[in-house]
Design a protein with these regions (language model features):
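Short helix/loop segment immediately N-terminal to the Walker
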Residues: 110-124
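C-terminal catalytic core of Y-nucleophile DNA break-rejoin enzymes
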Residues: 83-105, 122-145
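Catalytic-site neighborhood detector that most strongly recognizes the C-terminal catalytic loop/helix
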Residues: 18, 76, 184-210
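Basic, Lys/Arg- and aromatic-enriched nucleic-acid-binding interface segment
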Residues: 1-58, 66, 90, 98, ...
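Conserved tyrosine-mediated DNA breakage-rejoining catalytic core shared by Y-recombinases
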Residues: 7, 48, 57-112
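Short, polar N-cap/turn motifs at the start of nucleic acid-interacting alpha helices
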Residues: 62-67, 156, 175-195
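DNA/chromatin major-groove-contacting recognition/catalytic segments
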Residues: 4, 26-30, 81-84, 198-218
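C-terminal catalytic core of tyrosine-transesterase DNA break-rejoin enzymes
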Residues: 43, 47-54, 139-140, 144-152, ...
Length: 218
């Protein structure tokens, strides 16, 4: 059975659906026409593979705009901030130039927005704030995601599906499984191997075909 979209946490399991390539194309196309905060939230989740709670726990001083990485060291729910449960969840996640450009633009946007309200943006401020300048809630992120999926005509996928999509596409592109595991903050590589076993089986089949082609071309 498919998971329904709710504001609750989802277990990292094979039941979490990822986007197909066509669905992702539609989703990103819709996202490009949204406001800058919406773009930042969902492109960060998609391109970093971080958990929703990790995004909610990010502060500006956790983002290195020179070296292009997120320093993930906390997680946040609707009732406060906590340290990650495992040591491997504390990690650096590097991001690309296009996300860097978007984040810089968003930072200027936030500086101007807060300045109009007589507030100076601090490095200790949360990366994502609500319109009332409070930490964004899980339910708000989920609601925004539902609207985007409806516009993109994508069904039966959760916010956690963005993390699953990130990992799936990396593995399909041939990324080292150990690197993917570290990037996701998994406790050990066996978790990654178990969760993405179906994707890895397809990679194994392609590897077998590749060996056949290599021998034929000797």
């Amino acid at each position: 059975p498919s998971n329904t979209l709710t504001g609750f946490k989802f277990d990292l399991s094979n039941n979490v659906r990822s986007f197909s390539k066509k669905e992702l194309q539609r989703f990103v196309a819709v996202l490009e026409n949204e406001d800058i905060q919406t773009q930042v939230i969902f492109l960060t989740l998609l391109k970093s593979g971080m958990r929703k709670g990790e995004l909610m726990g990010l502060r500006w001083n956790d983002i290195d705009l020179n070296e292009k990485y997120f320093d993930i060291n906390s997680t946040r729910g609707d009732y406060g901030e906590n340290k990650p449960k495992t040591k491997t969840s504390i990690r650096k996640v590097y991001f690309d130039n296009s996300l860097l450009t978007l984040i810089k633009k968003y930072k200027n946007h936030e500086k101007e927005r807060l300045f109009r309200e007589g507030i100076i943006l601090s490095d200790k401020d949360y990366f994502i704030l609500s319109s009332r300048n409070l930490p964004i809630t899980q339910s708000r992120i989920t609601y925004m995601f539902r609207l985007l999926c409806k516009k993109a005509e994508v069904q039966n996928i959760t916010v956690h599906g963005l993390r699953h999509t990130h990992a799936t596409f990396l593995i399909e592109a041939g990324a080292n499984i150990k690197y993917v595991s570290t990037r996701l903050g998994h406790k050990n590589i066996n978790i990654t191997l178990d969760v993405y076993s179906d994707v890895l089986k397809e990679e194994e089949k392609e590897t077998a075909d590749l060996m056949d082609k290599l021998i034929e071309n000797l």
